[in-house]
């Protein structure tokens, strides 16, 4: 299957050419040996810089009139109808792409994606889903920033999406997965009233698969396969983990084995998936360096090839709206 992947070159904290270099590395890797077609979305000045690059013969370039900056309000982002982000999502909505990757403004990407891409009808609200390495493999966490304030019903929806995601990527249809609610303590009485109600609902719905409240340290130990949280708490947790890993990488330097360095580089792999959409949208970190972008783009190709969004929708047994 040929994967048609769109990449937004604009809006991140890095130079757009860093994205271009990551694309080149993907095409030179074993991933690039499989059928893949890249379309990048960039402003005219960036397009001009790319014209003499040998890579331009292998990548389609779409010129955008503008781009969504990190400082743009949601209203400003929505008004930029011909931004690189908007054009990429339009192409995805029209079926010209199998997936879209952006390092741009998170709130704008979630809002624009939700307005342009049909949602799975059983999903109450989209969530940013990430995979993190654990002692037993990996765990998925959602939400990590799509929505700051959510209610218990929406948290249960996140749990269902996380479970559907794990099941959709598993080769064993009967493989059991466990869930935990990220909280300030493991006791049932801990947390806000919303957390307590969410705890009761998750226990009633998922039974023994729900292992109760978990603390931040439990995530990397591999205690559960799916971590459920609101966007505010999840985002703080994720950025704290990123900061810690970056600190360790800087302190230990060459003393880290190569395999461990790879784990740190791909802490968010393949970026944050906007789960709940019927089509694949990946949000890479705005500060992603070349190696992390390589991982995000490569992971997006793998997920598109696996038809992960269709599989999640099938798990919900529902149509899209």
Residue ranges and their predicted role:
Residues 11, 15-18, 39, 43-45, ...:
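Glycine-rich phosphate/diphosphate-binding loop of Rossmann-like nucleotide-binding domains
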Residues 1-47:
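N-terminal phosphate-binding or glycine-rich loops at protein starts, especially the Walker A/P-loop
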Residues 15-20, 49, 81-92, 99-113, ...:
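Short glycine/serine/threonine-rich phosphate/pyrophosphate-binding segments
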